[in-house]
Design a protein with these regions (language model features):
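Conserved donor-binding/catalytic core segment of Leloir-type glycosyltransferases
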Residues: 145-169
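A short acidic (Asp/Glu
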Residues: 51-57, 81-84, 117-121, 140-141, ...
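N-terminal pre-catalytic "stem/leader" segment of glycosyltransferase-like enzymes
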Residues: 1-56, 60, 64-65
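Membrane-proximal helix-turn-helix segments that form the acceptor-binding/catalytic region
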Residues: 86-107
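A short, histidine- and acid-enriched strand-loop-helix "catalytic/donor-clamping" loop
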Residues: 49, 70-87
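Short, solvent-exposed loop/turn segments at secondary-structure junctions
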Residues: 11, 46-50, 75-78, 113-115, ...
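Structural motif
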Residues: 39-42, 68-70, 106, 155
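Donor nucleotide-sugar binding/catalytic pocket of nucleotide-sugar-dependent glycosyltransferases
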Residues: 102-145
Length: 171
């Protein structure tokens, strides 16, 4: 089941279990020599349980078996509205982010705002603004029969989950 049993954003147990199982598969490929310095690993979320094993393995492996690692930074400790602030996770998460910044090849963000946030927080690795992880045309294809903007009823739609992190009271 994909229901959130523990937590407010993703199920803490389910997310951790899935991430760790994926990392287990990656570690096996690294051990087998299937992953080399020509490979690139991309994580859609900087906080991925198990990620911390990569620098441990790569620092002890020959350079030809050290893949490039990129990941997406979604908000985390630089966003005062992020759920982890509310849940009291700031201190250990900031240290986790600093650990990640020590070994990744680069960090992807959605906008220039996040570049400023990360630099202010002391991040050193290259940061790339990649925009949103989906294309405008793909989104438009999912909504049939759209009207020109001037012909639409003026109303606000709240498309996020109903969590304080997304500030639903603003609407």
């Amino acid at each position: 089941s994909k229901a959130i049993v523990t937590g407010s954003v993703l199920d803490a147990h389910g997310r951790s279990y899935y991430s760790l199982s994926q990392t287990m598969n990656l570690v096996q490929k690294m051990k087998n020599g299937e992953i080399t310095s020509d490979d690139v690993i991309f994580y859609e979320d900087m906080f991925t349980p198990g990620l911390e094993c990569l620098p441990y393995i790569m620092d002890q492996s020959p350079p030809e078996y050290r893949p490039k690692v990129f990941l997406r930074f979604l908000a985390q400790t630089t966003d005062p509205d992020d759920f982890l602030i509310r849940e009291g996770m700031f201190d250990w998460m900031r240290r986790y982010e600093q650990m990640v910044d020590e070994f990744v090849t680069g960090i992807c963000v959605a906008s220039e705002v996040f570049v400023a946030h990360l630099r202010t927080a002391g991040f050193k690795k290259p940061i790339y603004v990649t925009g949103l992880p989906f294309g405008k045309s793909e989104v438009q294809e999912r909504v049939p029969n759209t009207k020109p903007l001037k012909e639409r009823t003026k109303r606000v739609g709240f498309a996020a989950r109903w969590d304080d992190e997304k500030q639903p009271h603003f609407y």
